[in-house]
Amino acid sequence: MPCSRALILGVLALNTMLSLCGGEDDIEADHVGFYGTTVYQSPGDIGQYTHEFDGDELFYVDLDKKKTVWRLPEFGQLILFEPQGGLQNIAAEKHNLGILTKRSNFTPATNEAPQATVFPKSPVLLGQPNTLICFVDNIFPPVINITWLRNSKSVTDGVYETSFLVNRDHSFHKLSYLTFIPSDDDIYDCKVEHWGLEEPVLKHWEPEIPAPMSELTETVVCALGLSVGLVGIVVGTIFIIQGLRSGGTSRHPGPL
């Protein structure tokens, strides 16, 4: 991937008392909202407009379909957002990008190496539907390819990605979800491609299935269990006999 693309990031409103430029101990906030985070990159006409709350995506504006896409459908039943507002912000960023590029003497953005982690949403049970999550952090600039592989073959069904979400250091993170049914015959990889990586990174995942006990192990376990049981019987018998003897010697003949 070429690394000479320019980037502009606009945060139009920040509904929080937290200073992103200050230290962590400056001001604490219970909730943080990014309302109107606009990203545009050129060439390629790549951009996004999102609203976030406490690090979770509320919605984004699909630039191709020109519509608002809610992270959860229930959000769209509570409030409305016209996609034209996001499209206008993208157009403004696109207009300003050329000016800022010239002022920066066409200096390209520094490419950071992203970090990826793969984990299941719920405890894994073979044959039970689950979701794999690929969490990719420290993304900059926000252009990345995330691909799911099952047994080294690309998977597209059951895949969902969030938009780029903003970190406090102005880098980004992104989550990719894959719905699947765990099987001991399948292995999965999350493939990450980014300008900051010399080669694609594969994060491997496969279900951890306890190895069955061998016949020798089963025999040893049974023998140990039987031995412990026999020892318990012998010790119990000894205590009973001692108790009876102790009770017999403590008896005294009563008056006639």
UniProtKB/Swiss-Prot annotation:
Coiled coil: none annotated. Residues 112-205 are annotated as: Alpha-2. Disulfide bonds join 134-190. It is a single-pass type I membrane protein. Its main location: membrane. The chain crosses the membrane at residues 219-244. Residues 114-206 form the Ig-like C1-type domain. This is H-2 class II histocompatibility antigen, A-D alpha chain. The lineage of its organism: Eukaryota, Metazoa, Chordata, Craniata, Vertebrata.
